[in-house]
Amino acid sequence: MAYLDHAATTPMHPAAIEAMAAVQRTIGNASSLHTSGRSARRRIEEARELIADKLGARPSEVIFTAGGTESDNLAVKGIYWARRDAEPHRRRIVTTEVEHHAVLDSVNWLVEHEGAHVTWLPTAADGSVSATALREALQSHDDVALVSVMWANNEVGTILPIAEMSVVAMEFGVPMHSDAIQAVGQLPLDFGASGLSAMSVAGHKFGGPPGVGALLLRRDVTCVPLMHGGGQERDIRSGTPDVASAVGMATAAQIAVDGLEENSARLRLLRDRLVEGVLAEIDDVCLNGADDPMRLAGNAHFTFRGCEGDALLMLLDANGIECSTGSACTAGVAQPSHVLIAMGVDAASARGSLRLSLGHTSVEADVDAALEVLPGAVARARRAALAAAGASR
């Protein structure tokens, strides 16, 4: 089997599994005052310190959550509510149409239920957005509560100009959040230097366990909690913390960040070999997303015209190649990718797209296997699409 779906989830690092298992053999609520509780508290604070160190944050800025979706919801809704409460005229969110649904659906929920307004930044054909467009949006509206722009796109791998955009947001006094879930372990991140107010990360995207993430939140940024209870995590995210998962995520973060330069160079070579092979061996195919250096090292996203992505996906799966038609959070939904549509791709082409994403366990044999199977699978999927089109007439 060749696993080419690292953008959906990554295999856990063995060291992260071992670190989690060691904690799971112990007991103790990190909020308890007895010996076991203090031991649990020490472990989670050490995990917090390690994650902060690797991502350029202060330990007090790391708020543990149950994953990337919660982190995005907490940032978008919580910061919006806080800004609106402090300045009632601020009811606008500026974001992009290529965000993950955790951000998009949070924004749309605020529009539908809280009377929020939204300004969508224009998307270029390669999936990028510009700091100039953000400046124009903020100059046009004095009611902006929050800017939210992802650091790197989860489908096509385009890296967005977060440093430049955060400077613009700061100039206008507007807090900015970034979904950096795809960026950890693939790009050098420094939360403190980024100028961001908040940043979302998820453990399972860089070799940690699923079900745990973090929101990095500056101390001077107010965020209304989604949940109420024991007041853990700066009274922003109540609930008994999952110490083992936090430790596993911290261990994975250390491995991913410390090995980032070497791993990115290795993945870039594998990805380029994959891209060159696909473009050479298959007709009527295009690579979606930005070129280097504004593309994640492990991402290759193609449109195979004349076939359905889901059909192609299943043909590949039957031959031992595991990949995706897009975000795993929307897989199985018979709709073209909202990211590709925002990039100007027509619906039919968008439905014929595949994402092949590499990660820390990827090797040359995975690329070889994909290149061996893909041409035949594409040809078969195209024949099936032609037959289906003929039968429907």
Curated annotation (Swiss-Prot):
[2Fe-2S] cluster binds at C329. This is IscS-like cysteine desulfurase. Disruption phenotype: Cells lacking this gene are microaerophilic and hypersensitive to oxidative stress. Moreover, they show impaired Fe-S cluster-dependent enzyme activity. It catalyses: (sulfur carrier)-H + L-cysteine = (sulfur carrier)-SH + L-alanine. It is an enzyme of class 2 (transferase). IscU is absent from the mycobacterial ISC operon. Gene3D superfamilies: 1.10.260.50, Aspartate Aminotransferase, domain 1 (3.90.1150.10), Type I PLP-dependent aspartate aminotransferase-like (Major domain) (3.40.640.10). Catalyzes the removal of elemental sulfur from cysteine to produce alanine. Participates in the biosynthesis of metalloclusters by providing the inorganic sulfur required for Fe-S core formation. One acceptor is Whib3, on which this enzyme assembles a 4Fe-4S cluster. It can use both L-cysteine and L-selenocysteine as substrates. The gene is iscS. The modification N6-(pyridoxal phosphate)lysine is found at K205. Homodimer. It interacts with Whib3, Acn, SdhB, FdhF and SirA, other S acceptors. The keyword rRNA-binding does not apply. The keyword Signal does not apply. GO terms for molecular function: cysteine desulfurase activity; iron-sulfur cluster binding; metal ion binding; transaminase activity. Pyridoxal 5'-phosphate binds at G68, T69, N154, Q182, A202, G203, H204, T240. It comes from Mycobacterium tuberculosis (strain ATCC 25618 / H37Rv). GO terms for biological process: iron-sulfur cluster assembly. Belongs to the class-V pyridoxal-phosphate-dependent aminotransferase family. NifS/IscS subfamily. It comes from the Bacteria. Its EC number is 2.8.1.7. Its cofactor is pyridoxal 5'-phosphate. The active site is at C329. Keywords: Aminotransferase, Iron, Iron-sulfur, Metal-binding, Pyridoxal phosphate, Transferase.
